[in-house]
Amino acid sequence: MNSVSAQVTFNHDQELLGEASDDLFGWSVDLSGDGNTIIVGAIGNNAGFANVSNNGHARVYRNTFNASFNSWSWVLLGQEINATASSVESGYDVGINYDGNAIVIGTPGQDRMRVYDLNVSDNWSPRNSNGYTISSSQSAQRAGHSVSINGNGNVAAMGAPLGNKVWIFDIEPNVGTGLMSGNPLVVPGTYAGGSVDLDDEGNSVVVGAYKSNSERGQVLVYDFNGANWVQRGQILSGVNNYDQFGFDVSMSNDGNTIAVGSKGWDSNPNNTTYEIGETTVYDWNGSNWVQRGSSIQGINIFDQCGFSVSLSGNGNRMAIGYKGSNEATTAAGLVRIFDWNGTAWVQNGDPIYGDGASVYSGHSVALSDNGSILAIGAIQGTGPINEFTNQQGQVRVYEGECLVSTSAVIQNGNTLTAVANASYQWLDCNNGNQPIPNAIEQVYVAQNPGSYSVQITENGCTQTSACFDITITSLKNEKIDNFLVFPNPTSNIITVNSDLFIQEMQILDVAGKLILTISNSNTADLINISPGIYFLTIQFNNGGIGHVKILKQ
């Protein structure tokens, strides 16, 4: 495999501020998948209730072109959405769908998650007048402590950590069936639902239970099979007491990569208050969750590495909040960006520091799907001129270079496979990177010795892989097309029908990870592979190779 991962500076784009003292603006933040819209929670805002704090509200901003100044800026979109009661901490967590036209707001003081859609007047209209709540027969669960919404805005999850539950709803307008599976998802552990995140389809969810086992913490992943939520793989656990593994979690779009923040981690298990922190990434290999690379650890006491985490859509870029870091100045906090280069997590650029003492930058972080837009919440930050007695909170937005999955180009003889769900153009490196005519498929079979690369376009971003040298001693590795794979889509077994003998079949996920190898057989059992898109490579006995995309349902 090879990769492209440049050191990118994230440039400060704009600063958004809370409207009043002690708003705690930036307590929560989320970016739309396209990176054009941002939602911010401010749990300290009084929301119109006189002399009462911690009511909370949420604001939404959209990146808008101003013709008068010939520039782009983040502009308030629609009305601010206030709490409907006092002391309910509305905005404790927030979520937004891919195009930024549907939002969810957690209100744990009411055990409620409210859903809004952007209407034709550019205001926010409630999708359900009462929001989505726990059953009236159940005691308070702090539901809404964590929330998430899927890419098209039709599935939403609400963590209820005092009940160790996650309430997951089908909220599709006019046809949504309400609570999926008919019951909330009951998750083992203590404070389960303290953190949640959905995949893009809304069929997978990662759940943190960070107070489990003397606050070692644990994380579980579930898939929806059409009727029930079923645990996928093993329970992931922290190492030491008070690690708080699962304090925050993030899931890639395909649901096969998760990032887990452990804000309380310390290499010395006897230290219960140092909170250096650690963040770990796991990939699904078809049967288990396997750690990807080394864990990323804080450096100093009170760093709280992993207080907040966010993955790009493809899971190859990660933003980590170090909320308590004293590196710049006391409790300024910081955020670091890491890119996966194919073998390790590499820090991208310099840390982004909070701009003053005790602003707690990194309390919340969010990345767009392509990893180019970054939002950072600092709950006690201020603007250039502090017009308030106390800090109102801030969110700073940054823009950098997008990230493309060029880390998964696989070479097999004279066959190159770009394993990414994207568009392709193969290039001739020995001819000034000139495009090869009609070479726009995922697989390229070189007919001549030389050096070749691929230009991949994904989520509006384009990058080029490194060059691969091809030495051809024969042309036996030709691309084979005369075979049939069925059924496709499949829920279980696939069969390859060909006149040629099959030596080996390999199944890879969209990130290029090998999921399954089958030798000397024309069938493959996918029963233990989670739903999604995969790539099947077939090695025939004549040296030929076949490739096909398969969909596991």
How does the language model describe each region?
Residues 423-432, 440, 444-451, 455-462, ...:
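C-terminal outer-membrane/trafficking sorting elements
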Residues 232, 292, 348, 462-467, ...:
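Extracellular and select intracellular beta-sandwich modules with Ser/Thr-enriched
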Residues 6-401:
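Conserved beta-strand/short-helix segments
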Residues 107, 160, 211, 418, ...:
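Non-cytosolic beta-sheet module surface loops
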Residues 130, 465-471:
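Terminal edge beta-strands and adjacent linker/stalk segments
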Residues 1-9, 475:
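Bacterial Sec-dependent N-terminal signal peptides
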Residues 20, 85, 138, 240, ...:
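Surface-exposed coil/turn segments at beta-strand junctions on protein surfaces, enriched
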Residues 411-420, 493-497:
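A short beta-strand segment in extracellular, disulfide-stabilized domains
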